[in-house]
């Protein structure tokens, strides 16, 4: 077992957002016309995005208030105190985990008199050092990409994509497995979350996995690239999805996009890469995205739903790579290039969300998400080592089952005390498998028993070339895992003081089998078209591992006085895994 702990230093800056499980907050000071602070002012934030309609707080002896656990959207904020005119702020926009500074100035008068303030300069977050980019529906829809946090996140300065990913332009990459890193950090430190709970697999350090909530079913996603708080065990990029909740009226949206090669530009002809020998460039063949969503009330102010689905595909021509005309012919040992090779990617997502206001102080929400994905066939074309993989030597990267179910509970016991709990159960199956039927150009599928050839200097392409069948050692795998993540927290918030304590844990099982084609456990080694040797591949091997616990406990506190904010936190983590009995 490995145990680690960390103490976040105290400082005269705020490093801790107040939001519940990465929700937004409104905080400020209420004064009278003379500048004196006003205790006892009732501050209410109301919005159509809240199934409970309104959240409220009362200013403390220093005139300060904080309203936490607010979902993204437009709010109407009112300030009310007997003997003073009511002040209303309209169209207050909240996004991400921001702590919005919103002060109130009350004039003497009757509460029946109302002063409405609108059209002012938007209030900004002055209390958090977290560097965060919030991508709402408007932003995601406006950017020509496949509308995932990975394709949009790379537009943030200092952020880049890690392994398993390509550069997406205009929806040309259906990126189901991706990672982001910021400021030179590690991709393994990335954490994807739904309502603040990790949506992680049991592999690769827990940075992610195949499941990604679809864009229409998401109200917004926030990408934190620095200044993360004690609720996180790692310091890498955090991507938090806020599910779309429906509402008190029926509404829907149907985003759709399509592109083909006639819409693509030419940045190849007459360029340096052509002069250096790139025989044909990569380009799009066709891609499309259909992502409808619909929601509304089952019972007004009580029970909401939102349903969404998504179908994406992208067919791309692969640079300097061609279908082999001699594929599936066991009598032919030479490579004969035909038409340009195509990489096919497709993804299907079904998602449902239900929100239930069980009582004034108990709100529940649940999300069901099921997905499948295939990059068919991938690992083709020019490879990092300099060799080229012909399409029949590639691998289908398939995710036939990606499923997660979330359950969250929020209870504002009072205007100061907030209780919350959330959990995710996830099941994932994926693997690198033999090329799928219909994805090899001039044939329906690869004939079992075809033996791959690895030529260090193919006489046709004048490069290292792998063709006829896959030539890697145990190139295929069948992997599955299940895991459960959960967390609980309690927040005690006054206007000047914010205290939060929480606990998170995860456990699960991962199993992976690597293998080669049973009908062809060998590879022919060639040089310049002549045989030089044979490589015999290993038999299937299965590795099993359990994550017994991945637990963390955190305590954080913040105190605000005047223009100063003092914050500090302590986090303790414990991790343990085990390996069931297994053999080679």
Give residue ranges: language-model regions:
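Periplasm-facing N-terminal accessory domains of Gram-negative outer-membrane beta-barrel systems
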Residues: 2-138
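Periplasmic N-terminal accessory/gating domains of Gram-negative outer-membrane beta-barrel systems
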Residues: 60, 84-247, 260, 264, ...
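Short sequence motifs at beta-strands and strand-loop junctions characteristic
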Residues: 69, 144, 173-174, 231-233, ...
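Residue-level signature of outer-membrane beta-barrel architecture
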Residues: 225, 243, 292, 296-298, ...
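Transmembrane beta-barrel wall of Gram-negative outer-membrane proteins
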Residues: 251, 282-374, 397-423
């Amino acid at each position: 077992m490995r145990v680690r702990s960390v103490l976040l230093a105290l400082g005269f800056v705020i490093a801790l957002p107040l939001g519940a499980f990465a929700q937004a907050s409104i905080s400020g000071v209420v004064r009278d016309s003379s500048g004196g602070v006003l205790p006892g002012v009732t501050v209410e934030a109301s919005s159509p995005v809240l199934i409970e309609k309104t959240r409220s707080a009362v200013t403390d002896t220093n005139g300060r208030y904080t309203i936490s656990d607010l979902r993204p959207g437009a709010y109407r904020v009112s300030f009310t105190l007997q003997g003073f005119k009511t002040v209303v702020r309209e169209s207050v926009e909240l996004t991400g985990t921001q702590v919005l500074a919103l002060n109130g100035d009350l004039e003497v008068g009757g509460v029946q008199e109302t002063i409405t303030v609108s059209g002012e300069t938007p209030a900004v977050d002055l209390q958090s050092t977290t560097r965060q980019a919030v991508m709402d529906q408007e932003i995601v829809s406006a950017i020509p990409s496949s509308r995932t946090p990975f394709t949009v996140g790379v537009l943030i300065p200092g952020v880049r994509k890690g392994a398993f990913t390509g550069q997406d332009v205009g929806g040309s990459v259906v990126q189901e497995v991706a990672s982001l890193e910021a400021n030179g950090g590690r991709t393994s430190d990335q954490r994807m979350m739904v309502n603040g709970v990790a949506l992680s697999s049991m592999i690769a350090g827990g940075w992610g996995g195949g499941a990604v909530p679809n864009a229409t079913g998401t109200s917004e996603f926030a990408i934190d690239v620095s200044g993360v708080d004690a609720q996180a065990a790692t310091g890498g990029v955090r991507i938090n999805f806020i599910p779309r909740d429906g509402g008190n009226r029926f509404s829907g949206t149907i985003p759709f996009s399509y592109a083909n090669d006639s819409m693509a530009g030419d940045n190849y002809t007459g360029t340096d890469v052509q002069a250096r020998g790139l025989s044909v460039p990569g380009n799009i063949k066709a891609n499309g995205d259909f992502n409808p969503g619909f929601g509304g009330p089952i019972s007004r102010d009580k029970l909401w739903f939102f349903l969404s689905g998504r179908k994406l595909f992208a067919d791309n021509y692969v640079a300097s790579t061609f279908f082999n005309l001699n594929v599936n012919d066991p009598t032919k040992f030479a490579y004969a290039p035909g038409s340009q090779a195509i990489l096919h990617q497709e993804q299907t997502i079904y998602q449902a969300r239900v929100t239930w206001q069980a009582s004034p102080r108990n709100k529940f929400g649940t999300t069901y998400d099921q997905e499948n994905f295939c990059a068919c066939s991938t690992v083709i074309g020019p490879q990092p080592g300099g060799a080229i993989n012909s399409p029949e030597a590639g691998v289908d990267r398939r995710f036939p089952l990606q499923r997660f179910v979330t359950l969250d509970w929020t209870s504002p016991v009072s205007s100061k005390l907030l209780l919350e709990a959330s959990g995710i159960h996830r099941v994932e199956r994926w693997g690198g498998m033999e090329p799928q039927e219909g994805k090899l150009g001039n044939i329906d599928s690869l004939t079992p028993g075809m033996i791959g050839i690895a030529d260090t200097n193919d006489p046709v392409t004048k490069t290292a070339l792998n063709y006829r069948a896959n030539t890697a050692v145990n190139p295929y795998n069948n992997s599955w895992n299940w895991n459960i993540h959960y967390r609980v927290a309690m927040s005690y918030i006054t206007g000047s003081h914010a205290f939060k304590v929480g606990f998170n844990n995860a456990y699960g099982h991962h199993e992976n089998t690597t293998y080669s084609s049973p009908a062809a456990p060998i590879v022919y080694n060639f040089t310049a078209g002549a045989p030089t040797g044979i490589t015999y591949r290993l038999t299937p091997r299965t590795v099993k591992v359990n994550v017994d616990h991945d637990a963390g406990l955190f305590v954080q506190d913040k105190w605000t006085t005047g223009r100063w904010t003092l914050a500090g936190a302590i986090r303790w983590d414990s991790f343990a895994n085990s390996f069931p009995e297994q053999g080679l």
